[in-house]
Amino acid sequence: MEHSNPILMGNNSPQKFITIGEVMLRLTPPNYEKIRMASAFEASYGGSEANIALALANLGVDSTFFSVVPNNSLGKSAVRWLRCNDVHCTPMILSTKEETPSHRLGTYYLETGYGIRPSKVIYDRMHSALTEYDLTKVDLDELFDGFDWLHLSGITPALNKNCADFILRCLRTAKEKGLTVSFDGNFRSTLWSWEEARDYCTQCLPYVDVLFGIEPYHLWKDDEDPSKGDWKDGVPLQPSYEQQDEIFQHFIDRYPNLKCIARHVRYVHSGSENSLKAFMWYEGHTFESKLYTFNILDRVGGGDAFASGLIYAMLHDYKAMDMINFAVASSVIKHTIHGDANITDDVSSIRNLMNMNYDIKR
């Protein structure tokens, strides 16, 4: 049964989606090798916001990605990767040596975990084209013209002040132009401190409609922080329904502009086996998804697949329980796909997982 979706601002026509961030070169030693022992690396591309644009494009959403990459073979190859997956890249900037002197594409190294050994990421993103380009030159009124939904994350502003100022400007402009805004805090301890992330991301909340994750934010006053036991920074790591409902309500009381909050909860059994479920606050109620247990081929991008799954479900006016279950199923499927992004192009495969249908498709 269809219902009026408050997130779509009364517009149930096909939506145009845009996201902004850094697309990176990903280098991974093959066969679960450790980086210090590797003699070769597999090359691919990724990045949180790019992953979401790509996942939505593969599911048929009109999806655009904006970034700055160097005008060289690496930058052009990253753009080609996006375009080959139906992501519109027209607004992307291929910078010159004069505009970005280091002329670098951001890079990260992934050491894939196995069994009890966790995966490890090493970033090499300083002086990348996105961080060096003068982002004040970007005309956001022109960039956002014709779009309905903007997605941002807390990763890009962690890169430097240039990016942090730009993302705040994006948030303000998007709200002025009436776009739906989603935001994922996506804390990365290797890029900035918890305190820096919390101060910045809390500034973003008044502009957000759909929030992914519940950290890092100034959620509690010092005298009411309930952290204890398996809680960290005022957030329960593996919450009960009642705990999560209380946390969500605390967000809504402070930020009534939020129309939806969603977080996934991971249970780590080993480096190669996890369980996953999610909670979502929507239209005054907290919903809890099914719990999935699965083996992992590639964990990177699981959170991005969750976000893209929920955005897709919202854009297609799913019922609340179907929205959160579709999001979790999208994330679970991503764990079975090598690379950063969820390249699933068959919505029925995600729905089948929602219904626990594992039959061979012929």
Feature annotation, model-predicted:
Residues 173-180, 255-259:
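A short helix->loop->beta-strand "cap" motif at the edges of active sites that frequently abuts
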Residues 191-283:
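Conserved phosphate/ATP/ADP-binding segment of small-molecule kinases
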Residues 166-178, 200-207:
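Catalytic-core regions built around general acid/base machinery
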Residues 62, 66-154, 181, 350-362:
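Conserved N-terminal subdomain of the carbohydrate kinase-like
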Residues 2-92, 113-116, 133-136, 288-290, ...:
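Glycine-rich phosphate/adenosyl-contacting loop at the front of the ribokinase-like
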Residues 126, 155, 186-190, 216, ...:
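Active-site beta-loop-alpha junctions enriched in small/polar residues
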Residues 181-183, 211:
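Hydrophobic faces of well-ordered beta-strands that scaffold small-molecule active sites
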Residues 271, 290-356, 360:
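Conserved post-catalytic alpha-helical subdomain immediately downstream of the catalytic base
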